[in-house]
């Protein structure tokens, strides 16, 4: 008699089969995150290309915004919906369009389509980094770093207009359209003087500076460990030894600044922390703008400038510029409101 010891083979369900197929080793990894990433990215990109090629913004912004109307790559856009539509999600099957594709495009339905699919596509890409990091056995800091751009996208394109009266006040998906949105933020919110904007600029420019310094320092301290024509050919991905000298780099920057990183782990964590924190802080600031929160208002300088024609600061001059932007931008940007400002209310600086 033969006795077999062990577990009886269990029946594999559809979930196990699907899990194996999704995680199969292939040129482009799919994974569970790909179920969200690939369709959403395809839809967002396809919607943007369709909108910038064929769809006008005449009915929502009174503008031409497509290649078909004569715009170029810098001036095309998928424009935000009309102000009158509020925060409607503008589904194709909704009451606004009622399955009429042409009407849906005219109302700005492609903007909400691109915005929502784009947001979920970015989230899918972050989940992809989590998933692959788990599969190969590394920590998920890449995904954590990518949360910065996601926070900026969600705060600017979704949270800000949700705090305003409609999707109309979100940026359009186009180069010139986003430039107009930046000017709008400055004129109506004095965004450049906002401390969260300052932290964002410090994070992004600081991250760029750290990246440049780090790359240059590594290139400066590469080991001359080969007779190849250049140092790049001497590198082997599987080599056991270091490819540059941390000790030499530390000595160099100690002489430059009197202080330097002596720990590679702290150094690279700092390079991660600076730009990601900057992105998150700017996102927090945008949410504040959505709620129309004010930042720095130096009222004493404004009062003195109003009373004394000879007193003016860069701050008061910028406030006047913001007033000018609001006065001249509102009639152009919100044609449907039919704003008319008499000449006497338009701002004039003390120097004019």
Swiss-Prot record:
It is a multi-pass membrane protein. GO terms for cellular component: photosystem II; plasma membrane-derived thylakoid membrane. Coiled coil: none annotated. The chain crosses the membrane at residues 40-60, 124-140, 152-165, 207-227, 278-294. It catalyses: 2 a plastoquinone + 4 hnu + 2 H2O = 2 a plastoquinol + O2. Its main location: membrane. The D1/D2 heterodimer binds P680, chlorophylls that are the primary electron donor of PSII, and subsequent electron acceptors. It shares a non-heme iron and each subunit binds pheophytin, quinone, additional chlorophylls, carotenoids and lipids. There is also a Cl(-1) ion associated with D1 and D2, which is required for oxygen evolution. The PSII complex binds additional chlorophylls, carotenoids and specific lipids. PROSITE patterns: REACTION_CENTER. It is an enzyme of class 1 (oxidoreductase). A plastoquinone binds at residues 214, 261. InterPro entries: D1/D2, Photo_II_D1/D2_sf, Photo_RC_L/M, Photo_RC_L/M_CS, PSII_PsbD/D2. Belongs to the reaction center PufL/M/PsbA/D family. Photosystem II (PSII) is a light-driven water:plastoquinone oxidoreductase that uses light energy to abstract electrons from H(2)O, generating O(2) and a proton gradient subsequently used for ATP formation. It consists of a core antenna complex that captures photons, and an electron transfer chain that converts photonic excitation into a charge separation. The D1/D2 (PsbA/PsbD) reaction center heterodimer binds P680, the primary electron donor of PSII as well as several subsequent electron acceptors. D2 is needed for assembly of a stable PSII complex. This is Photosystem II D2 protein. It comes from Picosynechococcus sp. (strain ATCC 27264 / PCC 7002 / PR-6) (Agmenellum quadruplicatum). The gene is psbD1.
């Amino acid at each position: 008699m033969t006795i077999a010891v062990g577990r009886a083979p269990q029946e594999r369900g559809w979930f196990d089969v699907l899990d194996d197929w999704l995680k199969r080793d292939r040129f482009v990894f799919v994974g569970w995150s790909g179920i969200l990433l690939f369709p959403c990215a395809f839809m967002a990109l396809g919607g943007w290309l369709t909108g910038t090629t064929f769809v006008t913004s005449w009915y929502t912004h009174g503008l031409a915004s497509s290649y078909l109307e004569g715009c170029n790559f810098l001036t095309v856009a998928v424009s935000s919906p009309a102000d009158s539509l509020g925060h409607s999600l503008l589904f194709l099957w909704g009451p606004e369009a009622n399955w009429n594709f042409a009407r849906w495009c005219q109302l700005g339905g492609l903007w909400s389509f691109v915005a929502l699919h784009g947001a979920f596509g970015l989230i899918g890409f972050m989940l992809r980094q989590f998933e692959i990091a788990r599969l190969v056995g590394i920590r998920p800091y890449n995904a954590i770093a990518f949360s910065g751009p996601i926070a900026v996208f969600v705060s600017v394109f979704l949270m800000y207009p949700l705090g305003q009266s409609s999707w109309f006040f979100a940026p359009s998906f186009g180069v010139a359209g986003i430039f107009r949105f930046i000017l709008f933020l400055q004129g109506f919110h004095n965004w450049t003087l906002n401390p969260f904007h300052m932290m964002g600029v410090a994070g992004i420019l600081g991250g760029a500076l750290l990246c440049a310094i780090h790359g240059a320092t590594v290139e400066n301290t590469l080991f001359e460990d080969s007779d190849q024509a250049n140092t790049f050919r001497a590198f082997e991905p599987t080599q056991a030894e270091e490819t540059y000298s941390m000790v030499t780099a530390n000595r160099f920057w100690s002489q430059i600044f009197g202080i330097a990183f002596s720990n590679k782990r702290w150094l690279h964590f700092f390079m991660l922390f600076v730009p990601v924190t900057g992105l998150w802080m700017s996102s927090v600031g945008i949410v504040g703008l959505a709620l129309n929160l004010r930042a720095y208002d130096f009222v004493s300088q404004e009062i003195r400038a109003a009373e004394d024609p000879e007193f003016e600061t860069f701050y008061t001059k910028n406030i006047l510029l913001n007033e000018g932007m609001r006065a001249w931008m509102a009639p152009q940007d919100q044609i449907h409101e039919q704003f008319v400002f008499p000449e006497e209310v338009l701002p004039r600086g003390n120097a004019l």
